[in-house]
């Protein structure tokens, strides 16, 4: 019982630490959110404002924008901790590594995925999403953005210290099945 409590406290500590650090750097969560909103805003401008045409594309546009926006924040999962030596301290602490990874993924999702989820709720009005598809879209985005954060952790871990584009090249092909399943609502 004491070991479970210690692991949960470790988990909470890492999540809280990452959230505090992320909100100190406003660009960490604002860049993906602003990118998402720009993409959503440009689609009706580029394709016209005909409601029936936009409504057929709306869930796909939201999903593609969410996928591309989440790729912008992939490098921030582990790179800063690697640069300042915190990641090494985490690894030699003796705590299970999976707790660290899950905590960092949850913090990453709370900083990038949750705002995208809220922004997608607003963006459905721009794209004339049919009312019956709103709830399934939000549920699929909830699960999909969590999975994208997990894949982002994989790409971020494989490319620690490298350029951000490399992690995007690794994560993008792996995220295509999530995109296909998410759009098929």
Please tell me what each predicted stretch does.
Residues 102-127, 147, 179:
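Hydrophobic alpha-helical transmembrane segments that constitute the membrane-spanning cores
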Residues 1-31:
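Aromatic- and glycine-rich beta-strand/loop motifs that create alpha-glucan
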Residues 26-48, 63-67, 170-181:
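Hydrophobic alpha-helical transmembrane segments of multi-pass membrane transport/permease proteins
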Residues 71-91:
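Transmembrane helix boundary and interhelical loop/hinge segments in multi-pass membrane proteins
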Residues 58-74:
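Long, hydrophobic alpha-helical segments
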Residues 46-57, 121-142, 185:
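Membrane-interfacial helix-loop-helix connectors in multipass membrane proteins
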Residues 95-109, 136, 167-169:
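Membrane-interface alpha-helices at helix entry/exit sites of multi-pass transporters
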Residues 143-172:
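A structural motif at transmembrane helix-loop-helix junctions in multipass membrane proteins
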């Amino acid at each position: 019982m004491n070991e479970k409590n210690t692991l949960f406290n470790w988990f909470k500590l890492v999540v809280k630490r990452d959230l505090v650090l992320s909100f100190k750097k406003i660009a960490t969560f604002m860049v993906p959110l602003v990118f998402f909103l720009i993409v959503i805003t440009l689609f009706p401008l580029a394709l016209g404002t005909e409601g029936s045409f936009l409504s057929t594309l709306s869930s796909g546009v939201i999903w593609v924008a969410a996928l591309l926006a989440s790729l912008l924040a992939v490098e921030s999962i582990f790179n800063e901790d690697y640069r300042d030596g915190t990641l090494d301290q985490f690894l030699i602490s003796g705590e299970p590594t999976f707790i660290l990874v899950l905590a960092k993924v949850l913090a990453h999702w709370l900083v990038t995925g949750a705002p995208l989820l809220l922004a997608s709720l607003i963006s459905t009005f721009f794209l004339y999403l049919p009312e019956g598809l709103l709830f399934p879209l939000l549920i699929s985005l909830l699960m999909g953005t969590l999975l994208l954060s997990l894949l982002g952790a994989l790409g971020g871990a494989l490319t620690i210290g490298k350029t951000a584009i490399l992690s995007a090249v690794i994560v993008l092909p792996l995220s295509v099945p999530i995109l296909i399943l998410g759009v098929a609502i």
